Amino acid sequence: MKNRNNAVGPQIRAKKPKASKTVPILAGLSLGAGLQTATQYFAHSFQYQAGLGWNINHVYTPWSILQWAGKWYGQYPDDFMRAASMGMVVSTVGLLGTAVTQMVKANTGKANDYLHGSARWADKKDIQAAGLLPRPRTVVELVSGKHPPTSSGVYVGGWQDKDGKFHYLRHNGPEHVLTYAPTRSGKGVGLVVPTLLSWAHSAVITDLKGELWALTAGWRKKHARNKVVRFEPASAQGSACWNPLDEIRLGTEYEVGDVQNLATLIVDPDGKGLESHWQKTSQALLVGVILHALYKAKNEGTPATLPSVDGMLADPNRDVGELWMEMTTYGHVDGQNHPAVGSAARDMMDRPEEESGSVLSTAKSYLALYRDPVVARNVSKSDFRIKQLMHHDDPVSLFIVTQPNDKARLRPLVRVMVNMIVRLLADKMDFENGRPVAHYKHRLLMMLDEFPSLGKLEILQESLAFVAGYGIKCYLICQDINQLKSRETGYGHDESITSNCHVQNAYPPNRVETAEHLSKLTGTTTIVKEQITTSGRRTSALLGNVSRTFQEVQRPLLTPDECLRMPGPKKSADGSIEEAGDMVVYVAGYPAIYGKQPLYFKDPIFQARAAVPAPKVSDKLIQTATVEEGEGITI
């Protein structure tokens, strides 16, 4: 009969179990016992005479009977036959017992631990293999007295070993991280703050209310030697300035594409695509007007800004027809009219008055944000450039701060910035000896909290598959799977973000859909179910029969209900977290980790780092920028 396949999945590569040696050992012992019995019986028959040879308290070696038979069988054949008979009886009984053992073993069912699934919780070796814990010390390190290897990278959770000792789980690979954590669950104090208080490279941080700036900017500037930039568009003081139009590669063949992508982001603030006729036509209009503003400002020596573009379209002292005429006759390049600018103006002149008015009003509505004098001032010039995030002499930490009441209206501007960061910093790759060569000075961590609230950023979803090769590591945080997969505000059910995140971690969810997703990620395991059946008369003192059966059944290693009931953090009366809750961590290719949430304020090192006061003024990098003609961004 062909051997059955009891190893499935990854177990197919596991070492095959060695054949049991129980039966051969029992058979050998049975034969040995027979020889020993025959020897002792023969010696007893001759009163343990000295001529029988060496012994210990009248106990002889088992093979002595064979030696004696060679010498004296001819003289005492009957005595030898009686001794042999006794030995054969003992050996026969032993061999019969061995045969029964083999029969019982052959007829006993063997449990298949992998029948319905082989999921299990990770142990320390699994976590070390996944790269979340430092590897154990080698023999050379032990002998030489070298310090044990330390972990580094972003914090993805914590884990308690069998002795109750807490270990931080950190990931330093180029792969991305995706976190599911409901609001007020402790993700900030457990994952974001520890990461920003230890990551020494460049970083882009979306910071709601400015809490992360207050807790981490001081340490990052003073001890991590970062330039810290606070971009808060709606703040009247303390914010760095950044003009998106400064990133356009004006005067190159890429200028039209750059402006087209910028205009698309302006008229599509939610990331739903250009669905209506008015969006498409207003996007085409903005392309022409922005290019016209850029060239006119360049020729006149004044800066081009989005507020100035809005001013062109909404100038109360000038008829809009004069603008269209100016765009068709102005000498943009070497005294010649720019074809993209002239075409956009001609389209508006050829439209019926009602249609052109609707297109114009639609375009102006998308620029209304820049009529706020505070926002207009903060986007009127650039104190830093996008490329400096990874190419400056020092690492750069960019905090994008939005207050809750300004979050919705500032979303289009934040979307423009995130889009530009991805497109500019992942623009080229050099190779040497068939391997990519780093063309950047500093790695970049994109810590995007509540990133689905920015709307669908198609470039972010697409770029996750390749930006790791450019030194960009994304740490994406969302509330639950529904927020991520929402068709209206998220990336839809066919999103590829989860596919491109090597590490996923989760705090206790609030929605059953997220719990079901986490349960599937954890996997299915096989457990043995015991069933006891009794029979007999109800009035009898003893039951007639009791039978026990065992059956392998499947169950999720973590059911959705168990996931929803994972212990969360314990909070005080005012809502402050006092004790950490549980969490789960998933690393592709390894068993799931049932972990413990870290808390930065429980660690004296993190407490000391968070106590470093944040700078009162944002750093400005533009003085050190050397921007050549035509250098800009692909957006």
Swiss-Prot record:
Main localization (coarse): membrane
Pfam families per UniProt: T4SS-DNA_transf (PF02534)
Subcellular location per the Swiss-Prot or TrEMBL entry: Cell inner membrane
Keyword set, alphabetical order: Cell inner membrane, Cell membrane, Conjugation, DNA-binding, Membrane, Plasmid, Transmembrane, Transmembrane helix
Record annotation: effect of changing D449N: Loss of transfer activity
Membrane-topology annotation of the record: Multi-pass membrane protein
InterPro entries in alphabetical order: P-loop_NTPase, T4SS-coupling_protein, TraG/VirD4
Residues exposed to the Periplasmic side: 40-82
DNA damage among keywords: no
GO molecular-function term, one example from the UniProt record: DNA binding
Entry GO CC: plasma membrane
Effect on the protein upon substituting K209T: Decrease in transfer activity
Transmembrane segments annotated in the record for this chain: 23-39, 83-100
Membrane-side (Cytoplasmic) residue stretches: 1-22, 101-635
SUPFAM superfamilies: P-loop containing nucleoside triphosphate hydrolases (SSF52540)
NCBIfam families membership: PRK13880.1
Function description: Required for conjugative transfer of plasmid RP4. Binds tightly and specifically to the relaxase TraI. Can also bind to DNA without sequence specificity. May form a pore-like structure that could serve as a channel for DNA transfer.
Family statement drawn from the similarity comment of this UniProt entry: Belongs to the VirD4/TraG family.
Description of how the protein assembles with itself and partners: May form multimers of at least 18 subunits.
Protein name: Conjugal transfer protein TraG
Species per Swiss-Prot/TrEMBL record: Escherichia coli
Gene that produces this protein: traG
